[in-house]
């Protein structure tokens, strides 16, 4: 999943139009306006939506379908790590937008890889300590 989303990010960065960048920014803003504490499931869905938009930006239908499927898995990951990860996710999204605005495909892909590795680590901790351990940390 990490390699797929990283590759899609790299491709999207190289091909996106200013309008598509605006759509990505809007996706991040929608997610940032939702409450993590009161409706984490909805916010997790909004966070994952960014990758669906990135998949569409690649212009490759098959890749977009794979990315959309990975975004579903990513939503499950967000649900597992819980709302305590919201600040980390939003910070990563903002760094990703900064790299995309700079048209730096390698830096954007690195941000995705780094962020998802961190979330996978948090997921392993949450599963090892019980499903509510991390989400109760906030």
Give the predicted meaning of each segment.
Residues 3, 18-80, 91-98, 107-119:
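Conserved amphipathic alpha-helical segments that form helical-bundle/coiled-coil interaction surfaces
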Residues 61, 81-83, 124-128:
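Short, charged/polar low-complexity linear motifs in solvent-exposed/disordered segments
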Residues 11-19:
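A eukaryote-biased feature capturing mid-to-C-terminal, repeat/solenoid-rich segments of large proteins
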Residues 105-138:
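C-terminal effector-binding regulatory domain of bacterial HTH transcription factors
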Residues 85-87:
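Active-site loop of classical SDR/Rossmann-like NAD(P)-dependent oxidoreductases
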């Amino acid at each position: 999943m990490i390699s797929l989303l990283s590759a899609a990010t790299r491709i999207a960065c190289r091909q996106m139009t200013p309008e598509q960048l605006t759509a990505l920014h809007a996706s991040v803003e929608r997610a940032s306006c939702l409450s993590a504490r009161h409706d984490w499931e909805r916010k997790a869905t909004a966070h994952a939506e960014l990758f669906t938009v990135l998949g569409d930006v690649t212009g490759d239908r098959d890749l977009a379908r794979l990315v959309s499927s990975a975004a579903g898995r990513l939503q499950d990951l967000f649900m597992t790590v819980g709302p305590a990860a919201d600040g980390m996710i939003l910070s990563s999204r903002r760094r990703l937008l900064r790299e995309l605005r700079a048209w730096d495909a390698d830096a954007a892909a690195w941000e995705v890889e780094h962020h998802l590795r961190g979330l996978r680590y948090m997921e392993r901790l949450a599963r090892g300590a019980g499903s509510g351990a991390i989400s109760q940390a906030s």
